[in-house]
Structures are given as C-alpha cells and as structure tokens.
Amino acid sequence: MAACTAQVLSLYRKLMKESNKFPSYNYRTYALRRVQDAFRANRSVEDPKMVEQLLNQGRDNLDMIRRQVAIGKMYPTQKTIVEG
C-alpha cells in the first residue's frame, strides 16, 4: 500500500504542476480546482483495483493537461483583468 500511496502522491504533484502551466488564468484555476476536488472525492477509496483504475484515469488526465497546455501556449490570448 505504501508504493500505491507514493504513486498517488506523485501523480497529484504532477497534475498540480502541469495545471499551473496553463497560460490562461481561467483554465489554470479550473484545472487546479478539478484536480483537488477529484483527489478529495476519492480520498477514502481503498480497493486496490479501484485505486489502479483511478490512477490510470489520472495519468490519462495528465496527458490531456499536457496537450492542452501546449495548445494554449501556441495560441496566446490577452490577459484578463484578474491576471493584471
């Protein structure tokens, strides 16, 4: 279980780090909030099969975030008032 916990924490850190790379404030805050909410919602899951399934889903989401960040950097937009 310790290895599993380490994998979950590693995935969480990677997701948060990648989500912070969004150039757009709105996308960045949305992605960060979604990652936090998903991990909080599944905090009590202990079934190894379910944990593995959630890890795979998280890895897929990490790949998606990386692609979206790359696309967002290719097509920059004007900063919002919140971004200053």
UniProtKB/Swiss-Prot annotation:
Alphabetized Pfam families for the sequence: Complex1_LYR
Q: Tell me the protein's name.
A: LYR motif-containing protein 4B
Recorded superkingdom: Eukaryota
Q: What's any one GO cellular component for it?
A: mitochondrion
Cite a single GO BP annotation: iron-sulfur cluster assembly
Q: Which residues cross the membrane?
A: none
Q: What gene is this protein translated from? A: lyrm4b
Give the protein family.
Answer: Belongs to the complex I LYR family.
